[in-house]
Design a protein with these regions (language model features):
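Positively charged n-region of N-terminal signal peptides that target proteins for export
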Residues: 1-5
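Bacterial N-terminal signal peptides
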Residues: 7-16
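Sec/Tat signal peptide C-region and signal peptidase I cleavage site
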Residues: 17-22
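A cross-taxonomic marker for long C-terminal extensions/tails that follow the last structured domain
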Residues: 25-36, 107-181
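Acidic/histidine-rich, surface-exposed loop or edge segments in extracytoplasmic proteins
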Residues: 47-65, 107-112
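Soluble non-cytosolic domains of exported or imported proteins
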Residues: 62-73, 117-121
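Histidine-anchored nucleotide/phosphate-binding helix
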Residues: 68-87
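Acidic helix-start/capping segments at beta-turn-to-alpha-helix junctions
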Residues: 88-106
Length: 181
């Protein structure tokens, strides 16, 4: 009798480990950002059988530079909505490309202060949380140049692409779904 109980406990432990990797329903992926309200009985829900490859186009600045960019919050909300139904995209399957007026949101504090007059970039903690969740946050090098931002001041959790235009075209041709600003 003791051996079957130990075997059952081992199986349950293994199942919970597998479930943690797959995503657990009700799970918040990005804590503190992208608040959601779970809804029962929705007609359409995230599909655990799909591979979510999504590209977020981030061009708009926040209403004021001391606020978190609402488009970055949208990325967190998307991940939390998926996580609420037990869906976790694979590493790099969610991509954020930042350009246009939003470009300064990817800079370290000193450069952000120079550009905006706000001492600390309120977006850096969210960008770090997104990266930890497997999101690839990128910035357009053409936008850096156009906004007179030194590429060396881009935050450590952000990659620099040749251009947002080519990134968006390439990823869509490879099957990423575009979510506009």
């Amino acid at each position: 009798m003791r051996m079957p109980i130990i075997a059952l406990a081992g199986c349950l432990s293994l199942m919970s480990s597998v479930n943690a990797l797959a995503g657990v329903p009700g799970q918040t992926v990005i804590a503190g950002y992208g608040a959601i309200t779970p809804i029962e009985g929705a007609a359409e829900r995230p599909d655990r059988k799909l591979r979510y490859r999504v590209l977020f186009n981030v061009t708009k600045a926040a209403a004021t530079p001391d606020k978190i960019n609402p488009s970055l919050e949208k990325v967190a909300r998307f991940l939390n909505l998926l996580g609420n139904d037990g869906v976790r995209p694979e590493q790099g399957d969610v991509v954020v490309i930042v350009h246009g007026p939003a470009t300064p949101i990817v800079t370290e504090d000193r450069a952000y202060a120079t550009k905006t007059g706000v001492a600390a970039n309120p977006n850096l903690a969210l960008i770090e949380a997104l990266k930890k969740a497997g999101v690839s946050v990128r910035v357009c090098s053409q936008a850096l140049i156009g906004n007179k931002i030194d590429p060396a001041t881009v935050g450590k959790n952000v990659e620099t692409d040749v251009s947002a235009l080519t990134t968006m075209a390439t990823l869509q041709l490879r099957g990423w779904a575009l979510i506009p600003d």
